[in-house]
């Protein structure tokens, strides 16, 4: 992975933080504040739901170059130069930055991702959905090495891949904690509540990422992301369960050796590495204490109980807009679950239903989406189809779930 960014004349890297009020964004600002000799904030962007947090960030950083997607929140904040549905994209286009951290949630991050790549800035990508949805569009817009992953698994893979040449790679191994329901059977999952799905055993994340981790949809998205970022075919990417979340991923080489990246679960490490790539940031996180007795476990993923990863693999192998459809169907189904309209297993069942009906979005002559509108049209169709599936799944299930939770 090459490094197209050398920094501007002042020596510090200018960082534009998209999704600054979320879990990744707030931790990134802490990393930047702790390393004023390495980084400076040149802009902030947020949806507007956590306005108090954004106002505190504005005061702490002194940054006035801010975008808020919600017009009402922007009006309440006052003196916001960019607001409205296209505010974040305009902020990216008009801000001189060395690094754009995209920590937005969901496929709405696609246009800002493309805008960041077009500016030539390094893209520190936490918004995996934009890569999953945009696929070949995003890759075509990127210079070699311009996209640096923030996800701990892909950050780990990028580090491990330094240990060999591309033709020496046998397979990638993505690790998964297994989520809060590891070891449960399919029947147990029927009674899972949003509160239970909102607690992760090892990571502290935002609501949607935590839910996606519980359903293993997040690992499905990461499988697609690994294929796109590193160009390794799907049949050479494995997913294994590692409950301790210390080994973040591994690369096995053709000579039988495996290189792993290990560290206690702390997102500040991959965040800092993405901001400073290829240089590391000293003291970003604590290291493993190897003199203290510990056990690291690895086990196969139960794909019968948690089929989300294999659905993602299937969508990725088909190509076209199928990965965008996987992502959009999940967003609708996950929201329906959080609202108590469907049961937990219906999230992945909805994705499967939508993919099964999506033949029209399969690739024509091996082609991917040609434009952003192609992606958005596919996702619009997927959301509509998902809502139909949710309505069907809701029959007889919502009342049972409400009774269980009352």
From Swiss-Prot:
Gene this chain is encoded by:
dxr
Q: Taxonomically, what lineage is the organism?
A: Bacteria, Bacillati, Actinomycetota, Actinomycetes, Mycobacteriales
Q: List the disulfide bonds.
A: none
Which keywords are on file for this protein? Isoprene biosynthesis, Manganese, Metal-binding, NADP, Oxidoreductase
**Which cofactors does the annotated protein need, by name?**
Mg(2+); Mn(2+)
Q: Know the name of this protein? A: 1-deoxy-D-xylulose 5-phosphate reductoisomerase
Enumerate the Gene Ontology biological process terms: isopentenyl diphosphate biosynthetic process, methylerythritol 4-phosphate pathway involved in terpenoid biosynthetic process
Residues that coordinate or bind Mn(2+) = 151, 153, 222
State the family it belongs to.
Belongs to the DXR family.
Q: Which reaction does it catalyse?
A: 2-C-methyl-D-erythritol 4-phosphate + NADP(+) = 1-deoxy-D-xylulose 5-phosphate + NADPH + H(+)
């Amino acid at each position: 992975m090459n490094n197209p960014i050398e920094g501007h004349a002042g020596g510090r890297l200018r960082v534009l933080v998209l999704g600054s009020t979320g879990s990744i964004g707030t931790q990134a600002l802490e990393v930047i504040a702790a390393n004023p000799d390495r980084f400076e904030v040149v802009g902030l962007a947020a949806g507007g739901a956590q306005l108090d947090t954004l106002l505190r960030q504005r005061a702490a950083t002194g940054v006035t170059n801010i975008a808020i997607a919600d017009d009402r929140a922007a009006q309440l904040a006052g003196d916001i130069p960019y607001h409205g549905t296209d505010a974040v994209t305009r902020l990216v286009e008009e801000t001189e930055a060395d690094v754009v951290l995209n920590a937005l949630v969901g496929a709405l991050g696609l246009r800002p991702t493309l805008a960041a790549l077009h500016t030539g800035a390094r893209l520190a990508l936490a918004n995996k959905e934009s890569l999953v949805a945009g696929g070949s569009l995003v890759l075509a817009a990127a210079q070699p090495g311009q996209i640096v992953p923030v996800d701990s698994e892909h950050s780990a893979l990028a580090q491990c891949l330094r240990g060999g040449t591309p033709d020496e790679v046998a397979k990638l191994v993505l690790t998964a904690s297994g989520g809060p329901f590891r070891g449960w059977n399919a029947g147990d999952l029927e009674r899972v509540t949003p509160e239970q799905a909102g607690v992760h055993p090892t990571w502290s994340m935002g609501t949607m990422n935590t839910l996606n981790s519980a359903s293993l949809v997040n690992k499905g998205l990461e499988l697609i992301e690994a294929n796109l970022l590193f160009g390794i075919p799907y049949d050479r990417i494995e997913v294994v369960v590692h409950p301790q979340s210390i080994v973040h991923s591994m690369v096995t080489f053709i000579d039988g050796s495996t290189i792993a990246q290990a560290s206690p679960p702390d997102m500040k490490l991959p965040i800092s590495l993405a901001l400073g790539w290829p240089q590391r940031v000293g003291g970003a996180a604590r290291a493993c204490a190897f003199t203290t007795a510990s056990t690291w476990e690895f086990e196969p993923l139960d794909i019968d109980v948690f089929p989300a990863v294999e659905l993602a693999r299937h969508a990725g192998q088909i190509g076209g807009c199928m990965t965008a459809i996987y992502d959009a169907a999940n967003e609708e189904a996950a929201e329906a679950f959080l609202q108590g309209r469907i049961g937990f297993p219906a999230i992945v069942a909805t994705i499967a239903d939508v993919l099964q009906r999506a033949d029209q979005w399969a690739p024509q002559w091996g082609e991917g989406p040609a434009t952003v509108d192609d992606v958005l049209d596919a996702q619009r169709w997927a959301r509509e189809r998902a809502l139909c599936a949710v309505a069907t799944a809701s029959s007889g299930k919502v009342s049972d779930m409400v009774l269980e939770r009352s």
